[in-house]
């Protein structure tokens, strides 16, 4: 059952680049357009999460501040189109979003301070969120500057030490069991055989940088999932929603459900109950522009949501 009220997660931006809110200051909301997913809450405050991963079409324009007062976006789902099979280094994307990473880090710290973070006895959220994120961010940024190919996890020198050794040996051993289960679930339902010998996983989840333990685990698991590949546009969509779901779950979401709103248009709604004092966050997505794989991948997404729910 979803609770009513207001909460601190009423904000917008991409996972790696929070462009719309900084404290109480609004800078404008990205449009509901190609390459974005709309999110709404029951208090009619629109939230937009643009798909800024390199595997999504970028939204270049911004709508004026008045968008906030235009009402509930519940019936205005986003249509995502574009090429979701991107490969190659994502260095530019990461470097351009350094400020956004810091904003997301600040958001996480605020949530922790309000009791959404490391307060449980089973170590679901560790007290090292900020420290680990900062520890990994600087070395990884330096690797980027040195010419890392993020798609292969190896630097220009070809050793891969910057990602594989640092993340796997130094970070994963300090992660909580809960986060490990989340990441196991994160990858479980989207493992496809690579058709050309490599994976585009990195470009699909690169926007998770700066979010604390979860992004470190995504990084550490990268070397173990090289067979994972974005084989179609519909796969790209659900890889993105999967990552976003994991991110919100990490912040304390009580996972909701996937609802079909319009079978003919293949229009779906994903509801997440964030916290007891918050309205539910509602994702809406219209997948009617695609012709195959929708129902199959939605079943996978539902399984993922259920798995997260069982972990709580």
Curated annotation (Swiss-Prot):
Lineage per the UniProt record: Viruses, Riboviria, Orthornavirae, Duplornaviricota, Resentoviricetes
Residues annotated as signal peptide: none
Native organism: Rice dwarf virus (isolate Fujian)
Bias-annotated ranges (Polar residues): 74-97
Region feature Disordered, mapped onto this chain: 1-37, 63-97, 114-162
Start-end of Low complexity biased regions: 1-23
Similarity-based family: Belongs to the phytoreovirus non-structural protein Pns12A family.
Segments forming a coiled coil: none
Protein's recorded name: Non-structural protein 12A
Record's keyword annotation contains tRNA-binding: no
The keyword Membrane belongs to this UniProt entry's keyword annotation: no
């Amino acid at each position: 059952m979803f609770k009513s009220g207001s909460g601190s997660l009423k904000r917008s931006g991409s996972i790696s680049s929070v462009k719309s809110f900084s404290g109480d200051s609004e800078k404008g909301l990205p449009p509901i357009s190609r390459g974005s997913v709309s999110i709404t809450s029951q208090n009619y405050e629109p939230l937009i999460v643009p798909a800024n991963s390199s595997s999504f079409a970028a939204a270049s324009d911004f709508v004026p501040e008045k968008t906030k007062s235009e009402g509930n976006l519940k019936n205005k789902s986003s249509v995502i189109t574009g090429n979701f099979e991107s490969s190659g280094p994502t260095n530019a994307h990461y470097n351009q979003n350094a400020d956004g990473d810091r904003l997301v880090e600040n958001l996480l710290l605020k949530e922790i301070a309000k009791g959404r973070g490391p307060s449980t006895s089973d170590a679901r959220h560790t007290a090292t969120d900020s420290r680990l994120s900062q520890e990994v961010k600087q070395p990884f940024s330096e690797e980027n500057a040195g010419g890392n190919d993020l798609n292969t996890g190896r630097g220009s020198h070809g050793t891969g030490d910057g990602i594989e050794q640092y993340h796997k040996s130094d970070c994963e051993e300090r992660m909580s069991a809960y986060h490990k289960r989340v990441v196991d679930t994160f990858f479980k339902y989207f493992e496809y055989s690579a058709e050309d010998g490599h994976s585009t996983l990195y470009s699909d989840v690169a926007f998770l940088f700066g979010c604390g333990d979860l992004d470190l685990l995504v990084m550490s698991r990268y070397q173990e999932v090289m067979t994972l590949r974005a084989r179609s546009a519909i796969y790209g969509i659900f890889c993105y929603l999967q990552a976003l779901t994991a991110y919100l779950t990490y912040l304390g979401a009580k996972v909701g459900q996937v609802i079909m709103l319009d079978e003919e248009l293949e229009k779906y709604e994903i509801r997440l109950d964030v916290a007891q004092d918050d309205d539910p966050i509602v994702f809406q997505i219209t997948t009617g522009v695609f012709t195959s794989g929708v129902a199959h991948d939605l079943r996978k997404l539902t399984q993922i949501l259920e798995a997260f729910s069982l972990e709580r």
